Amino acid sequence: MCETASRTLPPGITPISGDEARRLIHHTSGPELEALLDRAEAVRRAVHGDEVALCGITNAKSGRCPEDCGFCSQSARFEGADAPVYPMIGAGEIVEQAHKAERAGAREFSIVASGTRLAREQELATVEEALRRLRAETAVEPCASLGLMREPELRRLKDAGLMHYHHNLETARSHFENVCTTHTFDEQLETIRAAKGLGLKLCSGGILGMGETPEQRVEFAEEVRDLGVDCVPVNFLNPRAGTPMAHLKAITPEECLAAVAVFRLMMPAAHIFVMGGREVNLGDRQDLIFRAGANGTMVGNYLTSAGRAPDLTVGMVERQGLTLRPPDTGKAWAFDGHAPSDADWNRKAAEPRPRPLPVVR
């Protein structure tokens, strides 16, 4: 899904400075916001054209995470959280979900697992098998989001067919300890740099609306920019019951759009994806994410919450006069221009999931 963030920019397109970003991040109303969105859209069109990439995911292992990330319902530390709890699903189910996402228009498909890192050799072997099958049986570009990882593990996954590695910074360094205390900001950087050293495409962003200031949103964008990542997923907090951040008030749609636009102007070459929380925080203004400079979004469900039906997401893209970007794997794409409706997408919801593990508090 993601090309190099160091691509040559068209004449006249240069990243804005941090100082300018700190000024523009406050342009959240009236003519100032309109001008900011117009500027971001012009940069998006000049650098990325009118194609939008969709990403699908599978929650391959859920719950019982030992970390204390304050936004996450999968933490075992939060008694009131209600995320599903189950062990790593099989490679066959991962591939089945990838086929489903591909038919819905996904260009990239990510295998996501809860926890600090993969805890067992068998889990790593399952992901390896799934990656080999994804490359053989689908056209999607395989991605994984498996927590903190070392170079030898990442190399095994790359050899199995991994194209992209996703690991969010989550927030600015100055705000990180307010979000998580069980691992450090620098540990996250180590994982990202290990993936980059292997030549994997990098996907790293975070969540806005976790109590950070507008200036810290810019600080966060500067840190992501300096890593030279290919894709920047921008999420907005969707407060989950039982988590320490359940009480936080959603940031306004205007704040969301201004942040996306500033990120686009700071990182013209990066692929910027508006992901989780867009339905809750933007509501009927979701269509404006592309005017704000985004050139990608999620299709289907999130990790522990429902997303829009795929046909609504594809329709949102098409209403803006944009088209879906196919994978770069050189294989025939299963998307035929008709994304499934909500009824089709959730047809298998009643089928049994893997046997849940008991919740250990």
UniProtKB/Swiss-Prot annotation:
Residues 339-354 have a biased composition (Basic and acidic residues). It comes from the Bacteria. Catalyzes the conversion of dethiobiotin (DTB) to biotin by the insertion of a sulfur atom into dethiobiotin via a radical-based mechanism. InterPro entries: Aldolase_TIM (IPR013785), BATS_dom (IPR010722), Biotin_synth/BioAB (IPR002684), Biotin_synthase (IPR024177), Elp3/MiaA/NifB-like_rSAM (IPR006638), rSAM (IPR007197). [2Fe-2S] cluster binds at residues 110, 143, 203. This is Biotin synthase. It comes from Anaeromyxobacter dehalogenans (strain 2CP-1 / ATCC BAA-258). Homodimer. Keywords: 2Fe-2S, 4Fe-4S, Biotin biosynthesis, Iron, Iron-sulfur, Metal-binding, S-adenosyl-L-methionine, Transferase. The gene is bioB. One of its GO terms (molecular function) is 4 iron, 4 sulfur cluster binding. It is an enzyme of class 2 (transferase). Its cofactor is [4Fe-4S] cluster; [2Fe-2S] cluster. HAMAP family: BioB. GO terms for biological process: biotin biosynthetic process. Residues 331-361 are annotated as: Disordered. It catalyses: (4R,5S)-dethiobiotin + (sulfur carrier)-SH + 2 reduced [2Fe-2S]-[ferredoxin] + 2 S-adenosyl-L-methionine = (sulfur carrier)-H + biotin + 2 5'-deoxyadenosine + 2 L-methionine + 2 oxidized [2Fe-2S]-[ferredoxin]. [4Fe-4S] cluster binds at residues 65, 69, 72. Signal peptide: none annotated.
